[in-house]
């Protein structure tokens, strides 16, 4: 019988701390990205968090500057109630890093180690898509944060039929691409569409 030794993007196959890996003695566990994602490790000296954009069940998203460019930084928190789900969410999001499409946010860098905060499962730096979400466009709501220097540039009028068709086309194009890669977006809502 043969063993499939291809790289795995999930850390779930690794032994727990102190356990043996394929019968080999104690090996120090180093949290790192799989080889196919090594290109995207974070240069921490070049990252400057500006302010919180929002937070959800698995973490928080910040506006930041990375190598002089405006980016979004997602810090995936360790979930004490559902650690497995938070790990799977982090690694599933990193699997998208290899993809490139105009309607899918590009991942710039990522790390499973966070120097400033040990309660973080990992950090993902993504291209910054702006503050204005489809939710803001539909409902004409104001700022994502109370930070007036980072105002939204949304048209607070009614969403026209032409605009709705453009948004729908872009959403469907992005989803069709993800589905062609066997990836399903599990949190699709107007607040997550930029």
Swiss-Prot record:
<protein>
    <recommendedName>
        <fullName>Serine/threonine-protein kinase mos</fullName>
        <ecNumber>2.7.11.1</ecNumber>
    </recommendedName>
</protein>
<keyword id="KW-0418">Kinase</keyword>
<dbReference type="InterPro" id="IPR017441">
    <property type="entry name" value="Protein_kinase_ATP_BS"/>
</dbReference>
<dbReference type="GO" id="GO:0005524">
    <property type="term" value="F:ATP binding"/>
</dbReference>
<keyword id="KW-0067">ATP-binding</keyword>
<dbReference type="InterPro" id="IPR011009">
    <property type="entry name" value="Kinase-like_dom_sf"/>
</dbReference>
<keyword id="KW-0808">Transferase</keyword>
<feature type="binding site">
    <location>
        <begin position="53"/>
        <end position="61"/>
    </location>
    <ligand>
        <name>ATP</name>
    </ligand>
</feature>
<dbReference type="GO" id="GO:0106310">
    <property type="term" value="F:protein serine kinase activity"/>
</dbReference>
<feature type="domain" description="Protein kinase">
    <location>
        <begin position="47"/>
        <end position="194"/>
    </location>
</feature>
<keyword id="KW-0547">Nucleotide-binding</keyword>
<keyword id="KW-0723">Serine/threonine-protein kinase</keyword>
<dbReference type="InterPro" id="IPR000719">
    <property type="entry name" value="Prot_kinase_dom"/>
</dbReference>
<comment type="similarity">
    <text>Belongs to the protein kinase superfamily. Ser/Thr protein kinase family.</text>
</comment>
<dbReference type="InterPro" id="IPR051681">
    <property type="entry name" value="Ser/Thr_Kinases-Pseudokinases"/>
</dbReference>
<feature type="active site" description="Proton acceptor">
    <location>
        <position position="187"/>
    </location>
</feature>
<feature type="binding site">
    <location>
        <position position="74"/>
    </location>
    <ligand>
        <name>ATP</name>
    </ligand>
</feature>
<dbReference type="GO" id="GO:0004674">
    <property type="term" value="F:protein serine/threonine kinase activity"/>
</dbReference>
<dbReference type="Pfam" id="PF00069">
    <property type="entry name" value="Pkinase"/>
</dbReference>
């Amino acid at each position: 019988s043969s063993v499939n030794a291809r790289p795995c993007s999930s850390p779930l196959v690794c032994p727990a701390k102190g356990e043996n890996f394929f019968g080999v003695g104690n090996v120090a566990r180093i949290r790192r990205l799989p080889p196919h994602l090594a290109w995207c490790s974070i240069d921490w000296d070049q990252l400057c968090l500006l302010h919180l954009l929002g937070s959800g069940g698995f973490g928080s998203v910040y506006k930041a500057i990375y190598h002089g460019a405006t980016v979004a930084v997602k810090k995936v928190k360790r979930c004490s109630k559902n650690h497995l789900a938070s790990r799977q969410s982090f690694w599933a999001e990193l699997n998208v890093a290899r993809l490139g499409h105009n309607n899918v946010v590009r991942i710039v860098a990522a790390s499973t180690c966070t120097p400033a905060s040990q309660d973080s499962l990992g950090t993902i730096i993504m291209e910054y898509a702006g503050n204005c979400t489809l939710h803001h466009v539909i409902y004409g709501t104001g700022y994502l944060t109370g930070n007036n220097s980072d105002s939204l540039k949304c048209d607070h009028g009614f969403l026209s039929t032409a605009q709705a068709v453009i948004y729908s086309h872009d959403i469907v194009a992005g989803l069709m691409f993800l589905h062609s890669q066997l990836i399903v977006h599990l949190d699709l809502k107007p607040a997550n569409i930029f």
